[in-house]
Amino acid sequence: MKPEELEDMTTLTIKTNALDNNIRIIKRLANGAKVIAVLKGNAYGLGLTKFASFLQSKGIDNYGVTELSDAVTLRRNGITGNILLMTPLYNSEDITTAIDHDITLSITSTDCAHVIDETAAYMNHPTVHAHLCIDTGFGRYGFLCSEEKQIADTVQSLRHVRITGIFSHFHAAACRNEYYVKKQFQDFTHLCDTPVSYTHLRAHETELHL
């Protein structure tokens, strides 16, 4: 059998009734908190636009992606809820594209914040929504928990950006390191006195196991 014929035999079957049940369980565990569906990596192989449309039909209206192209694709395919780009943008052209498609941006540093603010000013855009990203141990990007003054000074300097959320990512949730996860949680909540619409930290592993 030829390799291309083997590829044609690969099929992914998704049972929507099982997905529906999983959504209900997660909503129940969230205990009234909003659920953000993170759809990176082609929705973890489930198909970005089809899966997002299914989630939207089930009342999910918050989405997280790690690629600007995915955020734009969701908008162009009828996803009307909040879309958060969870990785930083430093290029004015990319930021302009995100603003044009009503994408919520992530601010991971003072430089990142200023580029977004300057781009919005150039576009004469009154308010761009953004979430602050805090590094509680993941080590990729984000303000450190010890940088409270820098965070405050950065936020106060913004004229065209409205901070609507603050988030971080559990570093060791999957391995169930309960002590370390709780330490991350404490470090994060220490910075969450700012009144914002969304404060999000949990991943599905912590929701199910902690």
Language model feature labels by segment:
Residues 74, 208-210:
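Generic leucine side-chain signal with a strong bias for well-ordered alpha-helical environments
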Residues 199-208:
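Conserved small/polar residues in nucleotide/adenosyl-binding loops
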Residues 26-32:
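Glycine-rich phosphate/diphosphate-binding loops that line cofactor/substrate pockets in enzymes
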Residues 3-6, 10-13, 18-21, 33-198:
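Active-site-proximal beta-alpha core segment in soluble small-molecule metabolic enzymes
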